[in-house]
Curated annotation (Swiss-Prot):
Pfam families: Med10 (PF09748)
Subunit structure: Component of the Mediator complex.
A GO cellular component entry from the record: mediator complex
Keyword Transcription regulation: yes
GO molecular function annotation: transcription coregulator activity
Key words, A-Z: Activator, Nucleus, Transcription, Transcription regulation
Cell compartments where the protein resides: Nucleus
Organism, scientific name: Scheffersomyces stipitis (strain ATCC 58785 / CBS 6054 / NBRC 10063 / NRRL Y-11545) (Yeast)
InterPro entries on file: Mediator_Med10 (IPR019145)
Protein name: Mediator of RNA polymerase II transcription subunit 10
Length: 146
């Protein structure tokens, strides 16, 4: 049901258990939707619908009372995506794209300021030769190590 996989490690066991509970809950919701859609109004369909509704309630209760559930906070934006019927993986992809663009913009600014520092330092060194040592010290302290 999910598009990503969680690596089987000891520290991931709570996350795997929660993911399994959520997957089972999603399946129950799908089955409940089918039962509601195909409801014929008979006693048998009413009993099946009641049973499935009670199953969903118990699964929700189990998920809520699980000690692992509160370990993994879910962003409100993801919940909004799900409520709007959208795929939460789209939120993740869009978030990564926005972050990548922001990082690229910041990298460009850093390069521009580094170039400004170098050009300004060179011009100041040409005009004020006695400041060359201070300018070189500033350049050395403000140049990131790679």
């Amino acid at each position: 049901m999910t598009t990503s996989t969680i690596e089987q490690k000891d520290e991931n066991e709570p996350l795997l258990a929660t993911a399994d509970q959520v997957s089972a809950l999603i399946e129950s919701f799908i089955e409940l939707g089918v039962l509601v859609h195909d409801n014929q109004g008979t006693q048998q369909s009413h009993t099946a619908l009641t049973h499935k509704t009670n199953q969903v309630i118990s699964q929700l209760s189990g998920l809520t009372s699980s000690p692992f559930t509160h370990q993994f906070p879910i962003p409100v934006d993801v919940i909004s995506y799900i409520e709007d019927g959208r795929n939460p993986d789209i939120y993740t992809r869009e978030f990564i794209e926005v972050t990548a663009k922001s990082n690229a913009r910041l990298k460009g600014k850093m390069k521009a300021f580094a170039r400004l520092r170098d050009v300004l330092g060179e011009k100041l060194g040409n005009e004020f030769p006695r400041l060359v040592d201070s300018i070189d010290d500033i350049k050395k302290r403000t140049t990131p190590e790679e």
